[in-house]
């Protein structure tokens, strides 16, 4: 089996072939997801909430993400594997490169960073040193204290225009992929069409090139508040996890998910 690479994702964008991605944190689930057809996985700092029980992603460390990245890589050796750089792990150039290198050594193919134009020097520095970068705009959970909670971003025209500029700046700085979270579908379409790099949405409508969900949301096992954009695919699959993942993939590829009920206007 051939490994999935960024060249595949770029080709899928050109072909307008939508693709489904998930978070994963251990070898068993990573293997199961890959066997059902998931080709891109993210070891997200969401592990702080889903696995460690915190109320935000802020306490997560690079060592935490590296630990789970090693496990996921062993379970899914052929998937394109992204790893989140946690809060304050890319504050200085030296710190950024050391932490990114740790995640790449753990098995990541790409690191994901949250932030806009101010992050361009960091993205450029990593790209020049052969570390592929995925950007993350919209609702960036590491900025929860600035946003005052988990809120939809880019609804006002000024904010929407700035987000588009940030996306283009990150692409120009060398980002190869972009995650767009909790933005109005119209803005998501503008960004997706403006960029040559693939855009993965979460709470951004069905207009992006790909979709991602936290695995716990896709399987309906999230405790507490459930995001509007989430869908319990397990409940629609008679409790069969494999069938649930296949259904998720099918609905993303067909454009059936996310539906209007999962989308912000």
Swiss-Prot record:
Active site annotation, chain numbering: 181 (proton acceptor)
Residues noted as binding 3-methyl-2-oxobutanoate in the record, renumbered to the chain: 45-46, 84, 112
Coiled-coil ranges from the UniProt annotation: none
A Gene Ontology BP annotation from the UniProt entry: pantothenate biosynthetic process
InterPro entries membership: Pantoate_hydroxy_MeTrfase, Pyrv/PenolPyrv_kinase-like_dom, Pyrv_kinase-like_dom_sf
Subcellular location field: Cytoplasm
Cofactors (names): Mg(2+)
Top EC class of this enzyme: transferase
Cofactor binding note: Binds 1 Mg(2+) ion per subunit.
Subunit structure of this chain's protein: Homodecamer; pentamer of dimers.
Protein name, entry field: 3-methyl-2-oxobutanoate hydroxymethyltransferase
Organism: Yersinia enterocolitica serotype O:8 / biotype 1B (strain NCTC 13174 / 8081)
Encoding gene, per UniProt annotation: panB
């Amino acid at each position: 089996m051939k490994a999935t690479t960024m060249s595949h994702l770029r080709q899928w964008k050109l072909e307008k072939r939508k693709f489904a991605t998930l978070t994963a944190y251990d070898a068993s689930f990573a293997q199961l997801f890959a066997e059902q057809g998931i080709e891109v996985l993210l070891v997200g700092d969401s592990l702080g909430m889903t696995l460690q029980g915190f109320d935000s992603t802020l306490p997560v460390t690079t060592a935490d993400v590296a630990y789970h990245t090693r496990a996921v890589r062993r379970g899914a050796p052929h998937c394109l594997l992204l790893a989140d750089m946690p809060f304050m792990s890319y504050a200085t150039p030296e710190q950024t490169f050391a932490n990114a290198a740790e995640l790449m050594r753990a098995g990541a193919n790409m690191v994901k960073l949250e932030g806009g134009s101010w992050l361009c020097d960091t993205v450029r520095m990593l790209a020049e040193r052969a570390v592929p970068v995925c950007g993350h705009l919209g609702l960036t959970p590491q900025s929860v204290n600035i946003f005052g909670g988990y809120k939809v971003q880019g609804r006002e025209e000024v904010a929407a225009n700035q987000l588009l500029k940030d996306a283009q700046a990150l692409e120009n700085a060398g980002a190869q992929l972009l995650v767009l979270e909790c933005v109005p579908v119209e803005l998501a379409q503008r960004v997706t069409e403006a960029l040559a790099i693939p855009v993965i949405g979460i709470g951004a409508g069905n207009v992006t090139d790909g979709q991602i969900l936290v695995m716990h949301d896709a399987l309906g096992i999230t405790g507490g508040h459930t995001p509007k954009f989430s869908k319990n695919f397990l409940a629609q699959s008679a409790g069969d996890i494999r069938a649930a993942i296949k259904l998720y993939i099918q609905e993303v590829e067909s454009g059936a998910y996310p539906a209007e009920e999962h989308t912000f206007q």
